[in-house]
C-alpha cells in the first residue's frame, strides 16, 4: 500500500516537472517566434543632425563689424514605414521646424515616387543640396539665395528654400534622366497659403556619364508680397505678383560623395549655373562657378565667382563676389572652413567694395 502511494506521488511529481519543462520550452519557442517590436521599430528609424557656427568680419560702407554666429543646429528623423513608404521630420533648433513630409514609391524601381508635405523645392541645382556638402560658408550663391526664396528677397520673406506641396519625382532610362514635377503653395514654410494660386516647379536632369550632370529647372508662380523691395517699388505688401524663374547649369565630380564619410571620399568638383526670373515687371539674373579641389590628406581648396543683379533695368543693384578658401575635414562629415570674399558692389548695395572674412566649424552625424 505504501509502495503504491510512493509510486503515485513519484508519478505526480514527474508529470509536474515534465509539464513545467514543456511549458517553459513552449514559452521560449513562442518568444522566438514573436517579433521583437522594439528592435524592429528602432531599425526603421534613422537619426541625423548637424550644427554650423563660426565668426565673420565685414567692412561694408567702411564700417568694420565682426561677430560670432550660430547658423544652423538641425536634427531630423526618417522613418521607413515599409519598403515603399517613409516619413521625415526636420527641426532647426536655432530657427523653426524645417521639413515634414512623406514619400511613397509607386513603381517597383525608382521610376516614380510621390512626396507630400513641407520640403525643399527643386528649383536650381544648389537649393536641394545640404549645407553640409556645399563649399561656401554662406552656403548658396547670391542668385540661388534670392531666386529660390532662401531669405534675401523681402517680397517673398524667409523660407529657407522650402515650401508646402505635392511632388512627383523619379529616374528614367536606367538613371540617365532624373525628373521632378511639383505643385507648391508658394507661401513658404509653416504658413497657410495667402492667395488661391499654386506654383508649378519642374526640373530635368541628364546624366550622360558618371559624375557629370546637366540640369535645367523652371518656376511658374504667383507671389503675395509680405514686404517691400527698394529695387521693385511697384509691388506693395499684400499685392499678388508674377513670380517666375528659370535656371540651367552643369556639374562634374570625379567621384560620388560617400553618404556617411565625406572625408574619405572627397571628389574634385566644379559646378556652374545661370539663373533668371521676374517679380512683377522687374527682372533679375545671376550665376556662379564654384570649384573644390582636394590637395593633401583632408585639406581642400575652395574657389568661387558669382554675380547677381536684382534689377536688370536699373544700374546699381548688382553685386559680384570672389571667394577663395580652405576647408579641412577632421572627422567623417565634420570640417573647419576659412574663406575670404571680395565683394564688388553697385552703388545701391554699398558705397564702395568691401571685404568679408569668415570662419566656420561644422559638426555632423
Place the predicted regions along the sequence by residue.
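N-terminal periplasmic/intermembrane-space "pro-region" immediately following the signal or transit peptide
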Residues: 1-52, 103, 365
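Outer membrane beta-barrel
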Residues: 34-186, 196-201, 205-216, 220, ...
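A generic structural micro-feature
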Residues: 41, 67, 158, 194-196, ...
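Outer-membrane beta-barrel pore domains
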Residues: 59-63, 82, 88, 100-107, ...
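Charge-dense, low-complexity intrinsically disordered segments
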Residues: 155, 191, 237
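Active-site-proximal beta-alpha loop/turn segments in soluble metabolic enzymes
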Residues: 182-191, 226-234
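Short histidine-centered beta-strand/loop micro-motifs
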Residues: 192-193, 261
Amino acid at each position: 500500500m505504501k509502495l503504491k502511494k510512493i509510486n503515485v506521488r513519484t508519478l505526480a511529481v514527474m508529470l509536474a516537472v515534465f509539464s513545467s519543462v514543456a511549458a517553459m520550452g513552449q514559452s521560449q519557442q513562442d518568444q522566438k517566434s514573436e517579433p521583437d517590436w522594439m528592435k524592429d521599430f528602432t531599425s526603421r528609424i534613422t537619426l541625423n543632425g548637424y550644427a554650423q557656427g563660426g565668426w565673420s568680419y565685414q567692412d561694408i560702407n567702411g564700417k568694420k563689424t565682426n561677430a560670432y554666429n550660430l547658423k544652423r543646429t538641425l536634427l531630423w528623423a526618417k522613418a521607413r514605414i515599409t519598403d515603399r513608404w517613409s516619413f521625415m521630420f526636420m527641426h532647426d533648433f536655432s530657427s523653426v521646424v524645417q521639413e515634414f513630409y512623406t514619400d511613397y514609391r509607386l513603381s517597383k524601381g525608382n521610376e516614380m515616387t510621390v512626396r507630400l508635405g513641407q520640403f525643399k523645392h527643386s528649383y536650381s541645382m544648389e537649393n536641394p543640396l545640404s549645407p553640409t556638402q556645399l563649399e561656401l560658408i554662406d552656403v548658396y550663391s547670391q542668385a540661388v539665395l534670392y531666386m529660390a526664396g532662401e531669405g534675401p528677397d523681402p517680397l517673398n520673406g524667409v523660407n529657407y528654400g522650402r515650401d508646402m506641396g505635392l511632388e512627383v519625382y523619379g529616374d528614367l532610362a536606367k538613371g540617365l534622366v532624373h525628373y521632378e514635377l511639383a505643385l507648391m503653395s508658394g507661401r513658404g514654410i509653416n504658413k497657410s497659403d495667402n492667395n488661391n494660386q499654386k506654383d508649378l516647379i519642374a526640373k530635368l536632369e541628364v546624366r550622360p556619364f558618371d559624375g557629370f550632370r546637366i540640369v535645367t529647372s523652371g518656376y511658374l508662380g504667383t507671389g503675395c508680397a509680405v514686404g517691400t523691395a527698394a529695387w521693385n517699388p511697384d509691388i506693395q505688401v499684400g499685392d499678388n505678383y508674377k513670380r517666375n524663374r528659370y535656371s540651367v547649369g552643369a556639374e562634374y565630380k570625379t567621384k560620388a560623395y560617400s553618404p556617411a564619410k565625406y572625408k574619405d571620399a572627397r571628389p574634385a568638383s566644379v559646378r556652374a549655373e545661370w539663373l533668371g526670373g521676374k517679380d512683377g515687371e522687374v527682372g533679375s539674373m545671376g550665376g556662379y562657378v564654384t570649384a573644390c579641389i582636394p590637395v593633401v590628406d583632408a585639406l581642400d581648396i575652395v574657389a568661387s565667382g558669382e554675380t547677381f543683379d536684382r534689377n536688370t533695368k536699373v544700374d546699381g543693384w548688382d553685386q559680384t563676389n570672389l571667394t577663395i578658401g580652405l576647408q579641412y575635414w577632421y572627422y567623417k562629415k565634420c570640417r573647419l572652413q576659412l574663406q575670404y570674399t571680395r565683394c564688388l558692389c553697385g552703388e545701391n548695395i554699398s558705397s564702395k567694395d568691401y571685404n568679408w572674412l569668415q570662419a566656420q566649424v561644422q559638426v555632423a552625424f
